[in-house]
């Protein structure tokens, strides 16, 4: 490329003056070396003005032995610190290296002084970074592209195209990296507690709003996102958040309840979570979720779904919830559990929809005692099972049925949220005082919108008014 831009041939000794294009103008330099330095600086300036956004194309991202993952983690951290020292964005090639960072889940041995790589890791991280990395070995399990793709396929099936997407526990941002082309105009907001992971995510997705803090510290407005996706942390502990402390929620349940508050009525939350969210005997957390949302469906993943890239054998579920505008009159069946033919405790949803269990439920013995696990069929690929399960979810275009103008709602900056599925939309015969919040009606030839507090205001969305008034 450099040679094709020259106006005169440089001599082999580099002393011959040479001209190249810099900022769109031919500029002469005393030597090839000086021209190369100027060209490199121009490239770096262009990179700062328009840094690339990373797109995941490798379905095997993060796979490998513990040693391979450890080495790739170290390479990513070294590169991150080099980029930060130079105060510059990552190139597309450097993003490939950064994207291989998978955190330290399942790598407790890396933090043993007896490990031959221990000193490399210890010298590379600050004291705070080292403590955070060591603390993450139990729950920093990143999500494979196969699972993420299935979640986006389901969102598309529901009718989601573009909008404000929240990822409240993003790691290095695999959900952002797998964002389909058809959803590329979405506004992305991510939250990540771990400093290293969050800083890598910022280098991979420079156009996203990424907050490096605990989700409990965020102050997002309620009803401010169209969709929330992710793989939430799970464990037998709680976070301190004054608004939710009285509910005594375990961390994975907390992420659901808070995210449902942040998503608008009609919006969808799609999270990977522990099977305990649906199967545990205590229904309190599920009832809180049911007060806020309808369960569109759930997919139980085999306990090998995170084995290749996260090194974890754990049974997990993908839950798809659609935000309600008001609580239901009766709590749905999925807030409770029952027993299957083998006497195992399962959520009523899976008892009614066994086709959504991508394996066979069996009793197993773990280091913590007896448990149940979804054991896979070794002859069937997870990708094929997920594709079929997404189709079984149904609920086609529920997002579209909740919108007034299908092509514009998710790109609109209006403060009016789209009408929920059960709202009285465009029913001018309905008395105004009986309209539900977030509903639309025609009054005196004007399209009106009912806010959450009951006030009627003129709607900015006036298309179709002539049809409605005819």
List PLM regions with ranges.
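Conserved proline-anchored active-site loop of SAM-dependent methyltransferases
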Residues: 149-158, 162-180, 190, 194, ...
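Class I S-adenosyl-L-methionine
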Residues: 51, 55-204
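A short, charged, amphipathic alpha-helix used as a generic interaction element across diverse proteins
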Residues: 32-40
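Conserved Class I SAM-dependent methyltransferase catalytic core
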Residues: 195, 246-307, 314, 318-321
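Short loop/edge segments at beta-strand edges and connector loops
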Residues: 211-214, 299-300
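Short aromatic-glycine-(Arg/Gly/Cys) micro-motifs in beta-strand/loop hairpins
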Residues: 17-22
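Flexible, glycine-/basic-rich loop-and-beta segments that form/coincide
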Residues: 308-399
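Charged, often flexible domain-edge or linker segments that flank or initiate folded functional domains
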Residues: 40-100, 398-399, 405-408, 413-470
């Amino acid at each position: 490329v450099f040679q094709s831009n020259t106006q005169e041939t440089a001599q082999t000794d580099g002393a011959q003056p040479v001209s190249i294009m810099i900022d769109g103008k031919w500029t002469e330099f005393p030597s090839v070396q000086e021209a190369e330095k100027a060209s490199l600086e121009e490239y770096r300036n262009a990179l700062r003005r328009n840094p690339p956004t990373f797109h995941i194309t490798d379905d095997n991202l993060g796979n490998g032995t513990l040693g391979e993952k450890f080495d790739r983690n170290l390479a990513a951290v070294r590169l991150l610190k080099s980029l930060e020292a130079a105060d510059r964005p990552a190139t597309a090639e450097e993003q490939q290296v950064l994207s291989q960072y998978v955190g330290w889940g399942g790598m407790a041995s890396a933090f043993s002084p007896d490990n031959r790589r221990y000193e490399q890791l210890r010298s590379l991280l600050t004291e705070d970074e080292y403590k955070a990395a060591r603390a993450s070995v139990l729950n920093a399990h990143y999500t494979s592209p196969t699972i993420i793709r299935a979640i986006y396929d389901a969102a598309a099936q529901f009718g989601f195209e573009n909008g404000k997407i929240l990822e409240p526990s993003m790691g290095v941002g695999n959900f952002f990296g797998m964002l389909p082309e058809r959803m590329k105009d979405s506004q992305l907001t991510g939250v990540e507690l771990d400093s290293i992971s969050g800083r890598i995510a910022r280098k991979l997705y420079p156009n996203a709003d990424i907050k490096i803090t605990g989700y409990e510290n965020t102050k997002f407005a309620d009803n401010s996102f169209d969709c929330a996706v992710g793989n939430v942390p799970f464990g037998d502990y709680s976070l301190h958040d004054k608004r939710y402390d009285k509910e005594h929620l375990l961390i994975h349940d907390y992420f659901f309840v808070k995210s449902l508050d942040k998503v608008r009525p009609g919006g969808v939350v799609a999270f990977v979570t522990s099977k305990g969210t649906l199967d545990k005997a205590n229904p309190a957390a599920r009832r809180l979720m049911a007060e806020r949302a309808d369960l569109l469906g759930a997919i139980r993943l085999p306990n090998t779904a995170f084995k290749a890239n996260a090194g974890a054998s754990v049974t997990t579920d993908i839950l798809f919830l659609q935000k309600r505008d008001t609580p239901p009159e009766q709590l749905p069946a999925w807030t409770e559990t029952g027993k299957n033919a083998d006497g195992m405790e399962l959520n009523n949803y899976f008892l009614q929809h066994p086709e959504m269990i991508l394996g066979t439920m069996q009793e197993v013995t773990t280091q913590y005692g007896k448990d149940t696990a979804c054991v896979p069929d070794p002859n069937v690929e997870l990708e094929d099972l997920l594709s079929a399960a997404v189709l079984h979810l149904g609920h086609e275009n529920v997002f579209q049925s909740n919108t007034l103008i299908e092509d514009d709602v998710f790109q609109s900056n209006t403060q009016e949220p789209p009408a929920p599925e059960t709202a009285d939309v465009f029913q001018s015969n309905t008395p105004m005082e009986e309209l539900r919040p977030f509903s639309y009606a025609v009054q005196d030839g004007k399209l009106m919108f009912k806010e959450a507090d009951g006030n009627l205001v003129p709607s900015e969305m006036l298309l179709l008014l002539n049809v409605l008034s005819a």
